[in-house]
Each structure stands twice: as C-alpha cells, then as structure tokens.
Amino acid sequence: MATRHLSTQPAEQHHRRRFLDAALAVLTDRGVAGLTVRGVAERAGASTITVYTRFGGRVGLLDALYERAFDLLREDLQAVPPETDDGIADLLEVAQAYRRFAMASPARYGLMFERSVHDYDPDPALRAGVVATTFVEFVTKINRVSPPGVSARDCAYLLWTSMHGLVSVELTIRSQSHIEDWFLDPTAEAHGRMYRHGVLAMITGLGLRN
C-alpha cells in the first residue's frame, strides 16, 4: 500500500520543514491535544487551508510528522562518535543516544511508539520505511559484535525492545509523583545508570562481544 504521506518537490522542502517544525513545537508544548491542523497552522503563522494544501489534511500532516520524527532519531543515532576498536562501547553509545532522544521530547517519542494519537494509525508502508532506514543503525553496530551464526537482526530487535521498555517505564515514572521505597531514586542520573546497566545486561545475555 502506498503511504498517505504526500511527496514534494525540492523547492518546497523549506516550507514543508517550517510546518513540521511548527507541528513538533506544538506537540512538545501542548501535547497531543494541541496537535490539530488549526494549532499547527497558527504556530507556523499560516492558514489552515495552507496546511491542507501541503499535506492533504490531518492524517497527511501526522504521517509527515511521524516520518520527520524518525528522521530526527536517525540523525541523532548517526551523530554518535565514529566507530572505534571497541564495538561494544560503540553499540552502547548508540543506545545512549536513543535514550537521550526519547528524554528530549516524550511527546514526540509517544507519537512514534506509543500510539498516543488514539485515532491515528501510520500507514504500513510508511512504518516499514522508517523502520528500515532507522533501525539499520542498530543492526550495523550489532553486526560487528555478533557471534558466528547469530542473527544480527534478531539481536537488534531484542536489544531495542529492552531499550524501549526501559525508556517507556522511565518516562512513565518521571511523569508521575514519586512514591517512597521505589526501586531507584527519581533522578535522571539514577535512571541513566539503570538504563546503562540494563542495556549492558542484554548485550551480555545475547553473547555479543568484541
């Protein structure tokens, strides 16, 4: 199935980015409730008809925003330091970049992974495309440290689900009032240490090594 995401010519990219930046700002500042065509148009200083013209409506705008969010994640993963002789350390750097991305904008992360917009279901072809271009970063790093005969794709999936679980729980905990006698202190540093410990435990359990 073709995506609902509307393609544009290169000359339109600047205007398109302006609307997507506005949509990301609305999502961060006002949450999902503010993510309407009118809200995005107002933030971009444009009319609602302009948004409809460029994206075909709310679903087209959400598709484009969904795709843009994954573009930003991929850029962050690609921005980690160049590969070193320590493949495990390099993999851990990518995992840390993933957590930083999630913490930078929980609302954006929710749009990507948590179905936070209850009536929005990204087009399957669009989902397949963003997954293929983003999670290849994990597969590439894992390929360097996978034992012979072990599927790097399987390892990447298991590692990502662990990372996603840790991040999702952290976001939930940090959005709520702290309770006494919880497993760890309610600080970013404590959560960061637990995340690193969990990722390393999964790496070890998968038998990944330099």
Model-identified regions with their sequence ranges:
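Amphipathic alpha-helical packing segments from all-alpha helical-bundle domains
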Residues: 120-147, 153-157, 189-203
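Alpha-helical DNA-contacting segments of helix-turn-helix folds
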Residues: 27, 62-69, 112, 127, ...
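Helix-turn-helix
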Residues: 18, 26-60, 64
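Generic hydrophobic, amphipathic alpha-helix propensity
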Residues: 15-23, 40, 65-69, 73, ...
